Amino acid sequence: MTHDNRQLLPQETKLVTPNKDTLSSRYLHVLIIDNTLSTIEFVYMAVKAVLTQVDTLNALEQRKNRPTNRILGLSTSVSKRYINIPKFSSSGASNSQGVKTLAAIRKFCLPDKNCFRNFLSFSTTLFKVPSSIDIYFLFFTASTVSTMAARALDLEFILSSLKNSTSPESLLAATAKIELLSLAADSVTHNRVIAFINRLTPKKYHFDLIRQYAVFYFLNSTTLTSENKLLSAELLYEELSQIPSSSSSGTELENLNNAEVLYVFDRILNSIKMLKNELSSPIGKLRAQPAANDPGTDKTIKYSKIQSIIQKINSFTHENSLLANCRAVVELIDDLYRKLYSWFLHVLTFEDIQFPGDTFLDRLLKMDYCFTYYPSSNRHLIDLFEKTLDNQTFTNLDKFFDTSGNSPELLYQKTFSLKIFSKNLTAQDNGLYIYPLLKTDLSILDFLGTENILFHRGLIYHILHQKTIPQERENDLNKINQFFATVIQQVIETKSSCLPASLSQLLDTIFHFNRIGLNMETCRTYIEILSNHMATPDTQPIINTFTINLTHIVFTAHVFFICMENFSPTFIFYNRKKLILEQQRAILIIERNDYSTLWKQISDHIECLFNVSLSESFFKEYTKGGNEDQKQFLYKNLFEKWGNVFFPFTYSVSTSNNSTAHHITTLELRDICKEVYQSDSPDAYESLLPYSTHPSFKTLFVKIYVIPMVSHITNLTFDKLQSDCRLLTLIHACKLLLPSQHLLLHYMAWLYAFSINVDHIDLGTFTVIKSVIFKIADHINVMTHTIYSPETNLLVSILLNAYTNYLQKYVNPWIKQTITANFSLIQTYITFTKQCASILATKCNINLDNLFIYITIGTDKIVTTSFCSFIATCRNLVRQHEEFEKSLQTIQISEITLTGMLRNIITSVSSSKELLTNEALQKFIDTVQRISQHVNETYHSISVNLEKCKTSNDILIESLKKIIYIVDVLSSNAILNTSLASRCLEAANLAVSNNSFTILEIKKDAVAVFKPFITQLFESMKPTTSLHKKLMSTQKLTTDHIPFLDTFDDRYNLVRHVERQLNWYAAHAEAAQQDLITPLKF
């Protein structure tokens, strides 16, 4: 195929969508001919096509074989995955026979379909919100097809591919593949290794190093493909130990010869086996108890064991550092550190995080925390939790709980509340029980230690959603802010002289975070709470300080735990850390653009803690005894793995003198390079080797060959890049013809390895790959003294895939949860509004003889209820109205959050100024802007109508408050708070006051509409047994005064037919005595 850069424009794209009958299935399958559209653009087109009922084309035959598999010779141990396309049919469909098969297939899922349709229907019918096609876009979750998982080469395939090609350049290309992609361990046998070595041409490139240090080379370039990495490594050792040692050529790498490498590798295997056995020790053997040799201190067997293992791992890492960059060894070390991290988490116990001054509630919360997240080491808490509750005699549990509220913050400790009432640490809420929930307001701080506030997620939620703090509680919040500041200063803040943390210090940090209630799971919960929180201009400064400090601590802890979960002192983690930081930065900044300053502090701290690198002294010991060429190869190899220059290394590039290169003109050399670029042969670049010493060769080769190839590569979509072989060809050409450009080679190799190994694209990977592509462009500019800009299609396709995944992972779940909650809330509020409107249409009459209320509409009697029940209903309506005023604020918060997400997406995308000229990206931005506009319109319409509901409800609530005030004027609380005389005076004034009202005229047919709401309202207020009183019946009721009985208490009821009772006591003493005693007899 001719590499013509003019043939890079996207071809016409056709869309195939399912017909109307297929929309009932959960998954919407779509096909696209010639994969040139970005994911987001494609989603939008697919949605519009479906909604406009575009005819369906016949399903096309999928492509079964990826060319990359044939080119690379992937290991046979990797299973090939094919995608089966469902067959769609349409009577009106037509399709040409010559259409190419689809290159990439997308499967779009509609998990939120029903929820969102209900929401749209609700908005359209109730609030007259126009239903928009574009807003459906957010509810399509694109499931990216994993194109190529992490794969390794098969040595047998490499050997077979070299049968017909024995030139040094072909062998160099083969070694380049091995060093770039690594060999699968199960394909490396001693016979194949020997056969490969025998094919290498002596005194060419780095072939002598491979022949002389074969054990090191293959250990350095082999990946452990088995899940049991230790077993895979042991089998690899058995094969490598059978390779005969070759004679020395005069200079020798003392630490990398076959015998030395085998000896160290065997020691590594034995050490790892021993350490893994120790890390498998049951926690029971590590239970804290006084050490036999030091009974007078707080030292325990448990902590002695932990320190012993840490020391052994540190010693292991130091002793075997010279092989700690061989891929097979690196994977073993990485696996060991993962095991250590998991083990350390599961030796944490309740006793480790208990403070001496913990309150009763503190201890209960910490028991629940430890048992929930680290159950294997805290089984003993099941009995301790029950005993703690049974033995408490000084704490009144009533003070901990809220029996009437239903705010969302209460739900964060719902299961914990059930555990307390059931005295069972394993209890789970299945919706079968009703019980009071742990308080989340600031009053709970009377029973909760300041340093333990993060164990109470509901309280954190409550504080974040307040605009002001009561004056009497400001001191409590100040203490919390001081505690947060101390945590930031002592645990988080980067010191001026930043040094990498030792393994012991990293584990200590895990311990300190857990002591204040933070681990991976709780950090995620707090990030979710923070992402749904939006401060307003009228928020009190003390709350803003709380929010900023909390965000700093939670996000730092979150990134720390992610890094710690992946940590090992290897190049694997070094490269992984870059990706982690970019991923988390993208998530944080897209949530809140104003977090950019905060992110700088977080990333600096993480970089300081996890500063893994290579030293020059290590390199000198690593290459001890080696010659210049050997050191050069090893330096390049380390650079390609780490991707960074930790220390300079100067070397000379030896080239063969060839007079041919100097006897041709620059114009002739230009034509030769152009001919090579246009050649159909993938190995055509090898013919340029004789000309590589020409003074103009580097510049001409880069301009005529490299730049067009890079332009072609960056003009592909990411899916096409994965099946295109030209990037690999370019790497081989540069490795052969530009050997001194190791930075350029590294970035190209990284881009290639990323393209074939990645199985998930997110915003972090986009940032990293964008950086790599522009570094390639920068090196080209330096080499050619020109200004070259790569094409944008590749980066845009990756960016839009990343945003698709972001929408799927973060936005869609949030929208699903929020719309479901808002929809339920609005439905409940509408029912409440209808009840209020129905009561406004009624007239109530009281019968003073029996204290019953008769509720009528016009002449129709609706409900008869007792006065006490009526007043209770009035109080309940007022309480519900006040709760709705608070809970309806969540709709405003969700509007601010969603519009903020969309705005941040646009801002983030627009910040990539180099890509803004791309048409697909512009369509994406326009789509998100339209969605944002529709969201604003929808929420505005909802807000207007909710305000109308509130205005209507306010009329009734004001009337009910007046009725309640009249009833409460002589209540016991009112008398206690003032005096009996003042209450009687106020009651007298109310009795003679004139309260006029207007009766609404109600149509006769309206009675049938209002009656069900009124009946349901008063039926729900019939007296029932109080579950709370039952649960709290064990507590003795104490009082410091004799309470006044409420005015409408049963004992204040008027005596009926009093004339019948006159002179009842004028009887013989014996008869009167009998009348009094008889009711008391059983």
Swiss-Prot record:
An annotated GO cellular component: viral tegument
GO BP: any one term: virion assembly
Superkingdom of origin organism: Viruses
Major location category of this protein: virion
Family: Belongs to the herpesviridae inner tegument protein family.
Function as written in the Swiss-Prot or TrEMBL entry: Plays an essential role in cytoplasmic secondary envelopment during viral egress. Interacts with the capsid via the large tegument protein/LTP and participates in its transport to the host trans-Golgi network (TGN) where secondary envelopment occurs. Modulates tegumentation and capsid accumulation at the viral assembly complex.
Self-association and partners: Interacts (via C-terminus) with the large tegument protein/LTP (via N-terminus).
Name of the protein in its database record: Inner tegument protein
Organism: Human herpesvirus 6A (strain Uganda-1102) (HHV-6 variant A)
Gene for this chain: U30
